From Swiss-Prot:
Residues 184-211 are annotated as: Disordered. Residues 184-203 have a biased composition (Polar residues). CDD domains: Phd_like_TxnDC9. InterPro entries: Thioredoxin-like_sf (IPR036249), Thioredoxin_domain (IPR013766). SUPFAM superfamilies: Thioredoxin-like. It comes from the Eukaryota. This is Thioredoxin domain-containing protein 9 homolog.
Length: 211
């Protein structure tokens, strides 16, 4: 006797497969309707997109994207966040948890050239640590357009242990849309709670006023 559940599952799989096949057929039919002029327009558009992306990558690399580097002063921090649209900054001290974070940050810096990945020693940047309320180390400040948009504090959101994967950290950073991410994890759905934002530009002005 056939298993009714199995039959239902098979029907669902066939339905999905048929829908995908129909979609592909429609796309092929659309392409077949294009004449040479239409194809040339698509080709030119694609070339422009590729050229624009190549120019972006060249600029990102010139700014230090693609590698995980250390910021040695608070002044340099402000220069970095003003130069790059997206920055992930690791506030650290010389301890094991921060070294674990360093390992994952180094990997992500190479994978996400669109974002600048840096670190700064918290104890040597007291103004920033106080202004951004950095208490637990490691803490990642996720920065967009000079604003600290979100934080990853310690390992609590990464399973609470130091054996989390680079993908776990990647997904967490992607929630703040500080990196481009093509994954399908449900954890990337935007949070409903309002994130506290601190304007780094305001911090920079305050820093200048305190001198």
């Amino acid at each position: 006797m056939a298993n009714p559940i199995q039959e239902i599952l098979e029907k669902q799989v066939l339905t999905v497969a048929k829908a995908m096949e129909d979609k592909i057929d429609d796309e092929i039919a659309s392409l077949e309707k294009l004449d040479e002029d239409d194809l040339e327009v698509l080709r030119e558009r694609r070339l422009k997109q590729m050229k624009k992306m190549a120019e972006k990558k060249k600029r990102w690399i010139s700014l230090g994207h693609g590698e995980y580097s250390e910021i040695h002063s608070e002044k340099d921090f402000f220069s970095v966040v003003k130069a790059s649209e997206r920055v992930v900054c690791h506030f650290y001290r010389e301890n094991w948890p921060c070294k674990v974070m360093d390992k994952h940050m180094s990997i992500l810096a190479k994978q996400h050239i669109e974002t600048r990945f840096v670190k700064i020693q918290a104890e040597k940047s007291p103004f920033l640590a106080e202004r951004l309320k950095i208490v637990v180390l490691p803490t990642l400040a996720l920065i967009k357009n000079t604003k600290v948009d979100d934080y990853v504090v310690g390992f609590n959101e990464l399973g609470g242990k130091d054996d989390f994967s680079t993908e776990d950290l990647e997904e967490r950073i992607a929630r703040a849309q500080v990196i481009h991410y093509d994954g399908e994890s449900s954890s990337l759905k935007p949070k409903s709670t309002t994130q506290v934002r601190r304007n780094v530009r305001q911090s920079a002005r305050s820093d200048s006023d305190s001198e």
